[in-house]
Regions:
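Structural signal for hydrophobic/aromatic residues that build the beta-strand cores
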Residues: 52, 221, 296, 303, ...
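Conserved catalytic submotifs in the C-terminal HATPase_c
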Residues: 283-294
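Flexible, glycine-/charge-rich segments associated with ATP-binding catalytic modules
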Residues: 2-46, 67-71, 95-98, 128, ...
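ATP-lid-like helix-loop hinge signature
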Residues: 280, 313-350, 374-380, 415-417, ...
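Short acidic-aromatic loop segments in the C-terminal HATPase_c
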Residues: 363-367
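Conserved ATP-binding N-box helix of the HATPase_c
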Residues: 269-273, 299-328, 339, 396-405
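Beta-strand cores of modular interaction/reader domains in eukaryotic scaffold and signaling proteins
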Residues: 287, 297, 333-335, 346, ...
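Signal-transmission coiled-coils
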Residues: 3, 7-278, 282-285, 300
C-alpha cells in the first residue's frame, strides 16, 4: 500500500516546525564509547525520536513554501513527500511500556560522568548564514529561542547501568535503528532529486542560472541534510556496534582518521574515474606529500568525499586544458600540512585557472563548465544512481558544506595565465597562497591527537543558523548542547 500524505499530517508537521532544533556536538557523539549500554542507547533513541521529527518538519515546511513555483516542480514535491513520510513513521513509532522503577533508572545519572566541551564559531561562516528563515530573527528561524533549554535535552546521557535492563528496551533500540535505516535509504537520492527539481524549474522558467534566494535555500537544505544523516548514521552504527566493534571507531566517527590513507584512496579513485571518462591509458599523475602519522578525529566518509570531488575537478581541468591526446600531463600535487589547530590539504594543478570574475560561480549550484548538463535517466531517484564525472555543478558546493560542517572550509585560489591551480581543503583554518592557476584549500578543524574536549567543536546545520551574541555556540542546531 503506497503512502499518502494527509492534511492532518501536514498540520502536525507545521506545528513541529515551530520548535527549534537542538544542537549535538562531536564530543557527545564519541562519549558513547565502543559498546554503549542498552539504557544509554535507549535514552539516545528517545532524544532522536523527538529531535529528528523537528528537523524533518523544518525541511518539509521550507520545501512547501519555496517561491516562484519551485515548490510545484514534480521532483521537489517528491522530496517533500519523502521527508513527510519519514516524519510520519518516526512520530507513529510506539514506545515500550516500562515500569516507574525503570524510568527512574533511566533518568538517574551514571556514576561516572564527563564534562562536555564548549564550541567556537567557525570563522568561515557568517552568523545566520545557514539559518532556515533569516527574516524571522527568532533563533534559528524555526521558532523562538529557549535560552538554557538545550541542557535539558541531550543526545548522549549515560544511564545508571548497575543492573540489567528489560528486554523491551533492547527490542525498541533495534526497532528504532531499523526505522532509521529505512529512512536513510529513502533519502539516499535526495541530492540528485533536488537537482532534477532545479533543472525542471530552470527549463520551465527559461532561466540560465539560479538566483541568490535559491542558492541560499540549497545551502540551508543540504547543510541540514548533512546534520540529519550524521545523526541517523551515527545512531545506526552505535546500535550495530554492540555486536561488532572497532577500537578506532565510535559509530561512524573514527578517532584515528589517517589522512594519508584517505588521500591515497581518493587519488586512486579520482584517477580511475578520469581514465574511464576520457578513455585515457593513464590519467595525470598525482604526487602526495603527507606524513604517515597524521591522524585526527573525523568522519572518514566526509573527508573522502571532499578529497575525491576536488581531485576529480583538478584532473578534469588538466586533461581538458592540455588535451586528451597528450601523453605526459603535468603532475597534480596534494600537500598535507599539520598545524596546532588545523590540518590543511592543498591540491595544486596546472589546469589553466579560472577568471577572477567566474570564481563566485564555482560555488553556485547547477553551475558547470561542461557544455551540456547530463540528463538524468528515469531511475535517477534510486539509491544506486551514480552521477557522471562532471556536469551538475554540485561537487564543490557540497564539498564546502561538508568542510564547514565540522568547522573547516574549502577555498579556491586561481592564478589565471599561469599553469597551476590549487584546490585546498581545510580541516581547520590556514593562511597561504598557492602558485598556479587554481588552488583549493580544504581546512579541517581541531587540534590533532587531543581529546575531543580539547578540540574545537562544530555546529550542525540548523543552528549555524543562530544569530546569537558572542560566546553563544553557533552549532547548537543539531540537537545537542554543544553543537556538532
Amino acid at each position: 500500500m503506497s503512502w499518502k500524505r494527509s492534511e492532518r499530517l501536514m498540520d502536525t508537521i507545521k506545528h513541529y516546525s515551530n520548535f527549534p532544533a537542538t544542537s549535538v556536538s562531536l564530543r557527545q557523539m564519541v562519549q558513547f564509547g565502543e559498546k554503549p549500554s542498552t539504557g544509554t542507547l535507549f535514552r539516545a533513541s528517545q532524544f532522536l525520536s523527538e529531535e529528528l521529527p523537528i528537523r524533518l518538519a523544518h525541511r518539509v515546511q521550507e520545501l512547501h513554501e519555496l517561491p516562484d513555483g519551485l515548490n510545484e516542480m514534480p521532483s521537489i514535491c517528491r522530496v517533500r513527500d519523502w521527508y513527510a513520510q519519514s516524519f510520519d513513521e518516526l512520530t507513529n513509532l510506539s514506545r515500550p511500556n516500562v515500569s516507574s522503577e525503570v524510568k527512574n533508572r533511566l533518568l538517574k545519572p551514571a556514576k561516572k560522568t564527563e564534562l562536555t566541551s564548549k564550541g567556537s564559531q567557525n570563522p568561515s561562516i557568517k552568523p545566520g548564514q545557514y539559518r532556515s528563515a533569516p527574516e524571522t530573527g527568532n533563533g534559528n528561524g524555526n521558532g523562538k529561542e529557549a535560552k538554557g533549554a538545550a541542557t535539558a535535552r541531550r543526545y548522549y546521557a549515560a544511564a545508571d547501568d548497575g543492573q540489567e535492563w528489560p528486554v523491551e528496551l533492547a527490542a525498541y533500540n533495534t526497532k528504532f535503528a531499523e526505522v532509521l535505516e529505512k529512512i536513510k535509504r529513502r533519502h539516499d537520492s535526495v541530492v540528485t532529486t533536488v537537482a532534477q527539481g532545479i533543472l525542471e524549474w530552470k527549463r520551465k522558467k527559461q532561466r540560465m542560472q539560479i538566483d541568490h534566494n535559491i542558492q541560499a535555500f540549497l545551502d540551508r537544505f543540504y547543510m541540514s541534510r548533512i546534520g540529519i544523516r550524521m545523526l541517523i548514521g551515527q545512531h545506526i552504527a552505535l546500535t550495530d556496534q554492540r555486536q561488532r566493534s572497532d577500537p578506532n571507531y565510535v559509530g561512524i566517527i573514527c578517532t584515528k582518521t589517517n589522512v594519508r590513507e584517505l588521500a591515497q584512496e581518493a587519488i586512486e579513485n579520482a584517477r580511475f574515474v578520469c581514465e574511464d571518462h576520457y578513455g585515457l591509458f593513464e590519467a595525470p599523475k598525482v604526487q602526495l606529500v603527507c606524513n604517515n602519522d597524521i591522524s585526527f578525529m573525523y568522519v572518514p566518509g566526509h573527508l573522502s568525499h571532499m578529497l575525491f570531488e576536488t581531485l576529480k575537478n583538478s584532473l578534469r581541468a588538466v586533461v581538458e586544458t592540455r588535451g586528451q591526446d597528450k601523453e605526459d600531463f603535468p603532475v597534480t600535487k596534494v600537500i598535507v600540512a599539520e598545524g596546532q589547530e588545523d590540518i590543511t590539504i592543498k591540491i595544486t594543478d596546472e589546469g589553466g585557472g579560472i577568471p577572477r570574475s567566474a570564481i563566485p560561480l564555482v560555488w553556485t549550484y547547477m553551475y558547470t563548465t561542461v557544455d551540456q548538463t547530463p540528463s538524468l535517466d528515469p531511475d535517477f531517484n534510486k539509491s544506486d544512481f551514480k552521477a557522471p564525472m562532471a556536469g551538475f555543478g554540485y561537487g564543490l558546493p557540497i564539498s564546502r558544506l561538508y568542510a564547514r560542517y565540522f568547522g573547516g572550509d574549502l577555498k579556491l585560489i586561481s592564478m589565471e595565465g599561469r599553469d597551476e591551480w590549487t584546490s585546498s581543503e581545510m580541516i581547520r583554518s590556514s593562511q597561504g597562497r598557492t602558485q598556479g592557476n587554481r588552488s583549493m584549500r580544504l581546512k579541517l578543524s581541531g587540534q590533532l591527537g587531543m581529546e575531543v574536549s580539547e578540540r574545537r567543536q562544530v555546529g550542525d546545520a540548523e543552528e549555524m543558523l543562530m544569530d546569537k551574541g558572542a560566546g553563544a555556540p553557533w552549532w547548537r542546531s543539531v540537537g545537542m548542547e554543544e553543537g556538532m
